[in-house]
């Protein structure tokens, strides 16, 4: 497969306008490790001004809407990410005495929609107890940023709380309390900020392999890790209003390896279930796939930025994928993805967690619907 072509568009006075002279694009979505706190997606674009930055583009400023598109087929481009400009910095190149012209570079930093919530004062809003769906509607009304909790068919409840910090802090604690993931790189029909239930695991349409056939995607780098943050023998889950639940693995001695979580769980029973789930998940050290990396150019059929046929990179956190390595297939869940593109090459890195660290029973699912293969989720 040949090089992929990407374009970065900014919102101008009469619609989106493509940037020119792009030197590189770097994009990061999701997290790298399962227990890492959710964070806004980010992107960085470097462009060159061969005639100098004397007349900068007026719209290149904080808050301007941007999109990154794959336009390899110009007649049918598709968005892989959306967000806003957070910063623009310019490095001015001094011309040489021999007559070489100015070499000015602008670095445009961008961020997903969750970042807006991180700067938005909660104003001590009294969030009523209720389903997460209803709480997200209230949060949307108060913040002005559309958001939703995407379930896997279950109904989750959230405790009453006062949003005394930022709306981003409330969303992050809600996600943590429910072991959920974040998607914030597109204005989807469900909202700009989506918290994804751990039961909402969407399978990729394609798989990864070191010896691919058909449309499977080929990777050339694979990493296995035994992360310290994936091993604890004591878990303590604190709630705002119902006390703390602490559970301990059997047969262990002090000093304990303790994972402490501050949640807004709706009851002590919910905290108990969460604590036991986390302990059962992480009480045994494991060596597992943590990431794989692949280039666009090595694919027979390129699908790396659209492995769910109707969605793109912004949709990846929470999707399941099979990775085949030396004849063994490992079911995994995507935690995050990064893309690094230059005119010479485009590389994607996928950060994953093993299916055994996502212990949920999802009926009729090829991986998570097998009894005796997974512990029940809380």
Positions of the model-derived regions?
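Charged- and aromatic-enriched interaction segments used to assemble
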Residues: 74-77, 94-228
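Surface-exposed cap/loop segments at beta↔alpha junctions
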Residues: 2-5, 39-42, 48-148, 347, ...
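Extracellular/virion structural assembly segments
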Residues: 24-66, 114-117, 128-130, 301-314, ...
